[in-house]
Amino acid sequence: MADEEISKAFRDLQFKTNETRMRIVQGEQNKKVNYQKMRISESTKKNLVDLDENLKYYRSVGRMFLLTDKPAEISRHEAEAKQSKEKIEAIEKQKDYLEKGLVEAETNLRELIQSRR
């Protein structure tokens, strides 16, 4: 009876550690995507600043293009970069939390294995 409970606890802890590792990897991928978005927005903003004020600025939305002005496009790219940066920070906080939980689960798993011997 106790052996079944230990094996069930072992499976649960192992599942939790695997799931946490997958969530950490997924968070790293999301962080890379947001970092790329941030770099693109900052680069585009930098290029827009150097362009003439009298040019027509078009923004693609789905299958159509919207005519906008230079300040609106610059502020849009600033907002996109800021939003991506905030998402990166949130992902970092979540990663720290998940890593703490992973360490705790691994410790519990080791203790469970040691108690079984």
UniProtKB/Swiss-Prot annotation:
Q: Does the keyword Protease apply?
A: no
Q: What is seen without this gene? A: Worms exhibit defects in distal cell tip migration during gonadogenesis, reduced microtubule growth rate in embryos, and larvae arrest and lethality.
Concerning InterPro entries, the annotation shows:
PFD_beta-like, Prefoldin
Residues annotated as signal peptide: none
GO molecular function: any one? Answer: protein folding chaperone
Tell me a GO biological process for this protein.
Answer: gonad development
What's in the keyword line of the UniProt record? Chaperone, Cytoplasm
Q: Which GO terms describe its cellular component?
A: cytoplasm; prefoldin complex
Q: Which family does it belong to?
A: Belongs to the prefoldin subunit beta family.
Functional summary from the UniProt entry: Binds specifically to cytosolic chaperonin (c-CPN) and transfers target proteins to it. Binds to nascent polypeptide chain and promotes folding in an environment in which there are many competing pathways for nonnative proteins. Has a role in gonadogenesis.
Quaternary data: Heterohexamer of two PFD-alpha type and four PFD-beta type subunits.
The name of this protein is: Probable prefoldin subunit 1
Origin organism of this chain?
Answer: Caenorhabditis elegans
